[in-house]
């Protein structure tokens, strides 16, 4: 004899009840329920409206960040030499460096970006020139140069050096970002790697470190 059953769905418990029937002609008394088709339809309609409203909600506007980045370094030393260096970069373009340093002897002075922003032992602890590509020292316009090779700044008769430098190798963001590194102004002129001295290809034979300052981001 084939088995017969009635499948009864209970909306209150969200389960299905199966009642076996040995005799298909036997009347079966189903559990009583307060379920009404109209109520179910109303619930579905409300859910549909909610989902439809969520799907049609307007997307949130994107946040746009400023493309201009700025940084500053305040240079101090053991002597009277001091100064301020500001850096500005537009999007992924070159970085513009504005320099003003006072207390120098008149004439050229080597000006470099050094690898570390560590001044715990004065300017000597800023380490070597920033050189992520492992090149020898050179002039700013040379293809083979340290990224931190920024040439010379020239102090006038009053000991004030002002300069604007535009350079592609000292970005404010990315893997070679200069933030957290240090600018150093030197005692002597940088020979730009061409002086023939044993230090020409490492430091430009620019002499001692007069003042230094760590690069930090500033508000745009």
Curated annotation (Swiss-Prot):
Please state where this protein is localized.
Plastid, Chloroplast
CDD domains per UniProt: Cu-Zn_Superoxide_Dismutase (cd00305)
Keyword S-adenosyl-L-methionine assigned = no
Task: Tell me how the cofactor is bound.
Answer: Binds 1 copper ion per subunit. Binds 1 zinc ion per subunit.
Keywords in alphabetical order, please.
Antioxidant, Chloroplast, Copper, Disulfide bond, Metal-binding, Oxidoreductase, Plastid, Transit peptide, Zinc
Its cellular-component GO annotations read: chloroplast
InterPro entries with a match to the protein in the record: SOD-like_Cu/Zn_dom_sf, SOD_Cu/Zn_/chaperone, SOD_Cu/Zn_BS, SOD_Cu_Zn_dom
Mark the transmembrane ranges: none
The molecule here is called: Superoxide dismutase [Cu-Zn], chloroplastic
- Organism of origin is Solidago canadensis var. scabra (Tall goldenrod)
Source organism phylogeny = Eukaryota, Viridiplantae, Streptophyta, Embryophyta, Tracheophyta
């Amino acid at each position: 004899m084939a088995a017969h059953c009635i499948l009864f769905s209970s909306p209150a418990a969200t389960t299905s009840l199966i009642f076996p029937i040995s005799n298909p002609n036997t009347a079966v008394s189903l559990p009583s329920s307060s379920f009404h088709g109209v109520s179910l339809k109303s619930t579905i309609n409300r859910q549909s409206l909610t989902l439809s409203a969520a799907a049609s909600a307007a997307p949130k506007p994107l946040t746009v960040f400023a493309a201009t980045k700025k940084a500053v370094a305040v240079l101090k030393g053991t002597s009277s030499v001091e100064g301020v260096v500001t850096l500005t970069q537009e999007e992924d373009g070159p970085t513009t460096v504005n320099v003003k340093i006072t207390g120098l002897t008149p004439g050229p002075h080597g000006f470099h970006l050094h690898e570390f922003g560590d001044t715990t032992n004065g300017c000597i602890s800023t380490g070597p020139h920033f050189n992520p590509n492992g090149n020898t020292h050179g002039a700013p316009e040379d293809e083979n140069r340290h990224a931190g090779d920024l040439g010379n700044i020239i102090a006038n008769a009053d000991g004030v050096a002002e300069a604007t430098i535009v350079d592609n190798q000292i970005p404010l963001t990315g893997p070679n970002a200069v933030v957290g590194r240090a600018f150093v102004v030197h005692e002597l002129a940088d020979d730009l790697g061409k002086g023939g001295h044993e230090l020409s290809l490492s430091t430009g034979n620019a002499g001692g470190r007069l003042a230094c300052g760590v690069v930090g981001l500033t508000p745009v």
